[in-house]
């Protein structure tokens, strides 16, 4: 009799445990932390385009000290919730050859990833980078303001 009761109880407890697991890749605390910095969700990924606060000068990939501090503060807060993996997508405006822009955008992604790793105190190997050049503008390249907005790094939070 006891043998017949054990199997249904085990099965029921497994079902209930599965129902209690968090939905999606991220916890509510992680989602709240990402939203507090302006990250937006699209197709299950959370990303932030660092164009408003952290712009790069034309033909440059160096971070200003205040930009570096902003990145490190954000990384520390997100890492404190367990978000320790990300992808940095570097971008440029439309000036220059494709190969030059791809290299420059990769340098931008790498400098942001270095600051992110330092601020979050996470291994640099947890962060991937890619240089996308001028392929994905977010603003018109016909104006100086639009070109400035396109010189950016987008941070995409990933899972291990």
UniProtKB/Swiss-Prot annotation:
It comes from the Bacteria. It is a lipid-anchor. It comes from Escherichia coli (strain K12). Keywords: Cell membrane, Lipoprotein, Membrane, Palmitate, Signal. One of its GO terms (cellular component) is bacterial-type flagellum stator complex. A lipid is attached at residue 19 (S-diacylglycerol cysteine). The gene is yfiB. Belongs to the outer membrane OOP (TC 1.B.6) superfamily. GO terms for biological process: bacterial-type flagellum-dependent cell motility. It holds the Pfam family OmpA. Residues 1-18 form the signal peptide. A lipid is attached at residue 19 (N-palmitoyl cysteine). This is Putative lipoprotein YfiB. It is found in: Cell membrane. Residues 43-160 form the OmpA-like domain.
